[in-house]
UniProtKB/Swiss-Prot annotation:
The keyword Nucleotide-binding does not apply. This is Minor spike protein. The virion is composed of 60 copies each of the F, G, and J proteins, and 12 copies of the H protein. There are 12 spikes which are each composed of 5 G and one H proteins. One of its GO terms (cellular component) is viral capsid. It comes from Escherichia phage G4 (Bacteriophage G4). GO terms for biological process: symbiont entry into host cell. The gene is H. It is found in: Virion. The keyword Repressor does not apply.
Length: 337
């Protein structure tokens, strides 16, 4: 576009200068043949004859109405043309330089580089060239994507944690219900087993005491065997001192039963006292059987009497294990009234 403008301006300038410098016809007279005729020896031939004009002048025939240019005028015309051409070229070059059309691509690139270096000294050449112009945009887009991904991950983690929490609550609820049911069933079964064991123990101990064919030592051994077996089944174990104390107490109860039974057999009259003694002997057998059973199944506090001289801490642990409040336990002969 700038080239077209510059060319138009140059053409206008050249045309104007040519018109001013060389406008109008030439007034100088020409020498040689004048007019429209060509003289020969015998004939006069008209100069306007086309064939003659062509033969003499060539293909370009000068205008017969204008004077032929002289040599001086031709030199001046050539000089003027060269001067005008020089002026026109110089002006056009200046104009093109002003608008930046006369420089090569490398020169223009150098000028742009120098301009950017002066205008933006804080930037490096790569940044001034614009090569990194898209990098901030790409980084920003990547940062936004990372933010979105992080947010999605956090949301997913929250949802997963919520689901896990709800699941754990449901599991805990089921476990609690199951545990309560199991505990209820276990306690019921334990109570049933406790009642059964107590009944069985009383029956066996009573049978042993009523078996008069057994000696005191045999009765004591059988009762102690029953007691220790039940204790081991319940997970309770006694020390040697505790076993000795239990054996002594059982032996004392057996002596009382034997004495009352013998006294009942010796007395022959069926007096009131005999009936009372007989009833006492019978009740004493049942009482002893129950007391021995309670020592294994549900003794609350009186088992301490069996453990006199033994470790008090062990006795407390044993009493706590059989704490159900159902029985007074085995009453000691040495218990203060």
């Amino acid at each position: 576009m700038f080239g077209s403008i510059a060319g138009g301006i140059a053409s206008a300038l050249a045309g104007g200068l040519m018109g001013k410098l060389f406008g109008g016809g030439q007034s100088a007279d020409s020498t040689g043949i004048q007019g429209n005729v060509l003289a020969s020896d015998n004939n006069v031939v008209g100069a306007n004859d086309a064939g003659i004009k062509s033969a003499i002048q060539g293909s370009t025939v000068p205008n017969s109405q204008e004077a032929a240019p002289s040599a001086i005028s031709g030199i001046l015309a050539d000089s003027g043309k060269h001067a005008l051409s020089s002026l026109t070229n110089a002006g056009a070059n200046k104009l093109m330089e002003a608008v930046g059309l006369s420089k090569s691509a490398s020169d223009k690139g150098k000028d742009t580089k120098d301009y950017l270096a002066a205008a933006f000294p804080e930037l490096n050449p790569w940044e001034r060239a614009g090569a990194g112009a898209s990098s901030p945009g790409m980084q920003d887009a990547g940062f936004q994507n990372q933010k979105e991904l992080t947010k999605m991950q956090l949301d997913n983690q929250k949802e997963i944690a919520k689901m896990q929490n709800e699941t754990q609550k449901e599991i805990a609820g089921l476990q609690s219900i199951t545990s309560r049911e199991n505990t209820k069933d276990t306690v019921y079964a334990q109570n049933e087993m406790l009642a059964y064991n107590q009944k069985e123990s009383m029956s066996r101990v009573g049978a042993i005491l009523e078996n008069t064919s057994l000696t005191k030592q045999q009765q004591t051994s059988e009762i102690m065997r029953q007691m220790l077996t039940q204790a081991q089944t319940a997970g309770q174990y006694f020390t040697n001192d505790q076993i000795k104390e239990l054996t002594r107490k059982v032996g004392a109860d057996i002596d009382a039963v034997r004495a009352n039974t013998a006294r009942t057999h010796v007395e022959t009259d069926r007096s009131k006292q005999e009936v009372q003694n007989s009833r006492y002997a019978s009740s004493q057998v049942g009482k002893t059987a129950k007391d021995v059973s309670n020592a294994i199944t549900d003794t609350a506090g009186s088992i301490v009497d069996y453990f006199r001289g033994a470790d008090q801490k062990v006795a407390d642990v044993y009493n706590n294990y059989f704490k159900d409040g159902k029985s007074k336990g085995i009453e000691s002969n040495h218990r203060s009234k």
